Amino acid sequence: MSMTKADQYLVSDIKNILENGYKDIDPRPKYEDGTPAHTISVNHVTRKYDLSRGEFPICTLRKQAWKTGIREIFTIYQNPTNVLSEMEAMGVTWWTPWDIGDGTIGQRYGATVKRYDLVNKLIENIEKDPYGRRKIMSLWQETDLRETPGLAPCAFLTIWNVRGKYLDMCMIQRSGDMLTASGAGGINEIQYAALLIMIARATGYEAGVFTHFVANEQIYDRHIENAHELLRRAEVAAASSAKALSPASSVEASGASSADTASASDAADASDSDALPMLILHKHSKCAISDIRVEDFEMTNYTPMEPQLRFELGI
């Protein structure tokens, strides 16, 4: 099994935090049992993927709920809402702890996108002024943050640039829980890469480079054991890939014909096993973003390692 570019980033980033991260003091989040949720973290993490070259950001070292991640991005940018019941109807259930008491997450995320009509303005800007440098969607609106309580947006800014036939996008995230959401090949990268694919399709471009910048990325203290498990899995994946590429120690063949057949079969198997995951949008070019459905997406060649890992959240 070949590791994806995201897997390689994840291994490097985990090692960096474990070796160089600093522990916070008096953290705001708490675990369900009331214990302060401490983290170790580093600042200014950057990752880059070229979707046009098959570098889709998804981790194979553990299973990612990629379809649910795309459903969440729909509730923010396609059918924007902050109402928990509407989010849950889309299968997005992890926002319940951030209910501000009125069945919403406050004037945040989808509510901000809807209030300022961010998606339609972005698409119009791309179509009318493709090489302009002002194509930005910002969820960080001070008026909204003051209006209601609620979790301040973590992934809050996207910047869009046209490059020939490609549409590139940079996503800025102020804070990221590496192993549950923001890390390489995690939910945040999957869903924003999907958003890039959607906006590119809606404007007639091909999805190009996706860059992810996290100002502060953390590993929670109760996630450290799982961090080491992911490093162990990476070693297993690397060893498996190396073994698949090495020549057989002994080959028994009765003649050239059967040997040639075996070699061809092995090559085909190796080619299949090395195929990397890719998110495919089954929609014709220049379709309206409102016409895209979650079911139009397909993840190909995705075989993550098992068993699934569980992570306790700091709220």
Spans of model-derived segments:
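Terminal, non-catalytic protein-protein interaction segments that mediate quaternary/complex assembly
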Residues: 1-246, 260, 266-315
